[in-house]
Amino acid sequence: MTLLKKLIAMLAVSFIGVASVNADILDEIPADIRDFVYDPDFMDPNQPLGESVYRNWKSDRPLPWTIGYASSYAGNLWRKGVMERLYGDYLPKMKEAGILNDIVVTQSNLKDAVQIQQMRQLTDQGVDGLIVCCSNPVALNPTIEYAYGKGVPTASMTGYLTSEYAISTSVNYKLTGYYIASWLAETIGGEGNVVIMEGIPGTSASDSQHQGMLDGFAEYPDITVVAEIAHMWTPQIAQAELQKWLSANTTQVDGFAVQSSGESGALNALESSGRDMVPMALGGGIGAFCYWRNNPDFIDRAIYAWPPGDDAEFAMNVLLRTMKGQGLKIQSILVPPYEEDVETIQSFVPEDCDRNSSEFRTVGIENWASDEYLNNFFDNGEALL
C-alpha cells in the first residue's frame, strides 16, 4: 500500500501506524498519533521534538492575561482569517471566561529585526504570553529566550521555532507537502510536468512543505518539476508570478502544487492563460473553491495545511493551557492534514459564489486540533472552557 493510500485511509477513518519512532518523549504520545503524524520518514529534521521546558512550569501572572501577537506579515487573506477568529470569536469567549483581557497585535512586514523589536517591546510592556506566526525558525531565538527570562512564553503557529524556549504548533508540513505531491502525481496519472508554488521562502512552514512536495514528486520518475515559484502566500502575487512564468514558457504543465493561500490567484492566472485547466492543489481559498464548486470534476479533494482561524485557535489553546500549568510534554504539537470533497464544498459555497472572494475556509477547531487531541500532549490536559 502506498503512503498516499495510507494517508487517505487514515484521514478518512482513523490513524494507522506506519513506522515506529524511537524517542523517549515521543513514547509518551499515543502510538496511533506518534506513528503517523510523527513518522520520522516524513518529518522535517529541524522540527523540535524534545521535552518541553514548560513541562513543570506555570505562569505566576494573575488572570486575566494579555497576549501579544507579533505577526510577521499582514498582506494576505490567510492573515485576515486569523484576525477574524482571534477578535471575532476567541477573545470574546475567553474574556467572558475570565482567561484573557486582550490580544495586542503588531506587524513586521517580513522584517526579522522589526519582529524582534516588537516582541521585546511587547514583553517589556507587560504582556503575559506571546504568539508568532510563520516566522524565521532561528532569528527570533534570542528574543524568545529573553521573554522566557521575564516569565513570558512564546508559541508559534504555522511553523516551528528552534529555540528550546518556544512552543511550536502546526500541521506536519513535510508530511502534508508529500501528501499533496503524491495526490497530484496520482491525479495526473503518475507522469507529466508540474509547477510547485511555495509560500515565503525561509519560513519553516513554507520550506518544510516545499521539501515534502519535492520528496513526493521524486518518487515518480516520470514526473518533472519544471518550475518552483514563490508567491508569498498571497493570491495577487501568485497570479502575477504565474502569469509571468506562463507567458514566458511554452512548456506543457499537467498539474500545479500550490501552497494554500495563493491558489485563487494561481487559478486565475491559469484560466486567463488560455491553457487547459489542469489539476491544482486547493487548500481553503473560497475564490478557488468557487471555481471547483461549479466544475466538480476539476479535482477530487481539497487538502488543508493551515485553516487560518483554526490554526490560530490551536496555538492560543496550547499557549493558555501551558500557562495554566497543564504540563506540556513536547516542544512541538503537530496535527495531520485534513481534507474535504466537492460535495462538502458545495454545501457551503453557493452556486453564485465570488471567484474573487477574500474569504478562507476554516474546518472547525474540533476537526483540526480538538481538546481531546491536545490532551495527549499534556500531563494534566483539560479543556480551557
Q: Each predicted region: which residue ranges?
A:
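Flexible loop/hinge segments that line or gate small-molecule binding clefts
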Residues: 137-175, 186, 193, 286-299
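An alpha-beta-alpha
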Residues: 67-75, 86-90, 178-228, 319-353
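Hinge/cleft segment of the Venus flytrap/periplasmic-binding protein
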Residues: 23-65, 216, 307, 313-385
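Hydrophobic alpha-helical segments within soluble ligand-binding/sensing domains
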Residues: 46-54, 115, 168-194, 208, ...
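Hydrophobic alpha-helical
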Residues: 122-124, 128-148, 213, 227, ...
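Bacterial N-terminal signal peptides
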Residues: 9-17
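Short beta-strand elements in bilobed, periplasmic/extracellular small-molecule ligand-binding domains
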Residues: 92-109, 194-196, 217-236
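Extracytoplasmic "Venus flytrap"
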Residues: 26-28, 34-93, 104-116, 133-137, ...
